[in-house]
Amino acid sequence: MAAYSAAALSWSSSSLLGNYKLSKNAPLGTAKLVERTSNFTIVCQKKTKKIRKIILKEDVQELGKKGQLMNVRAGYYRNYLLPMGMAQIVTPQLLKEMKIEEERIEAEKKRVKEEAQQLALIFETVGGFKVKRKGGKGKQIFGSVTAQDLVDIIKAQLQREVDKRIVSLPEIRETGAYTAELKLHPEVTARVQVIVSAN
C-alpha cells in the first residue's frame, strides 16, 4: 500500500473574469456581471519513497559488506540486488537466525583465544628451548637458528604443532640466549627463550 502526502490548494473560478460571471438573466445584447465566489480544494498526491530493510548476502561495492543490515530504496533492491542474489529482505526469523549465528561466532572466537592463552602459558612455563649447533671461532656457530628449527624443537619437546609463520625470531648466528615471539592469536603473544650452545 503506497503512502501519500497531500497538499491542499485553494482556487477560484476563471482567472480571466476574476470573481465575476455572466448573468443568465441579462437581456440579449447586454451583459451583466454578477459577483460570485466559489472555492474548492484540489488534493495533489505524491508517492513517498519506499525503503526496504535488507541484509547483504555478499560484499557489494560502494554499498556494504556481507552480513551487513541496511536500508535501500525498494527499486534498487527489486531491480538489482534481488535478481543478482546479493541481498534479501530482513524478516524476524532471519534476524533471529543472525543473532544465533553471531553468538556462535563470538563463542568460537572466545574459545580460540582461551586456547591460545593456555598455550602461551605452557610455552612461558617451559623456561627455554635448547638448541645445539656446531661451534666456530669464539661465540660463532656454523649456520643459523631459524623459525623452522624452533618449530621442530617445540614439536619434539611438547608434542605441539606450531606454524612457523607465527614465529618471530631474531637473527641467531652466535651462542647465547635469545627471545622468540609466537603470535598465537591477534591478542595473544607468547615469548620463549631460545638457548643456543655449541657442540
Swiss-Prot record:
Its annotated compartments are: Plastid, Chloroplast
A single GO cellular-component term on record: ribonucleoprotein complex
For this entry, list what GO says about its biological process.
translation
Q: Which UniProt keywords apply?
A: Chloroplast, Plastid, Ribonucleoprotein, Ribosomal protein, RNA-binding, rRNA-binding, Transit peptide
Report the domain of life of the source organism: Eukaryota
Transit pept. (range): 1-44
Q: Which Gene3D superfamilies match?
A: Ribosomal protein L9, C-terminal domain, Ribosomal protein L9, N-terminal domain
InterPro entries in the cross-refs: Ribosomal_bL9, Ribosomal_bL9/RNase_H1_N, Ribosomal_bL9_bac/chp, Ribosomal_bL9_C, Ribosomal_bL9_C_sf, Ribosomal_bL9_N, Ribosomal_bL9_N_sf
UniProt keyword rRNA-binding, yes or no? yes
Q: How does it assemble?
A: Part of the 50S ribosomal subunit.
Describe its function: Binds to the 23S rRNA.
Its family remark reads: Belongs to the bacterial ribosomal protein bL9 family.
**Name used for this protein in its record:** Large ribosomal subunit protein bL9c
Please tell me the species this chain comes from: Ipomoea trifida (Morning glory)
- Highest lineage ranks of the organism? Eukaryota, Viridiplantae, Streptophyta, Embryophyta, Tracheophyta
What gene name is listed for this protein?
Answer: RPL9
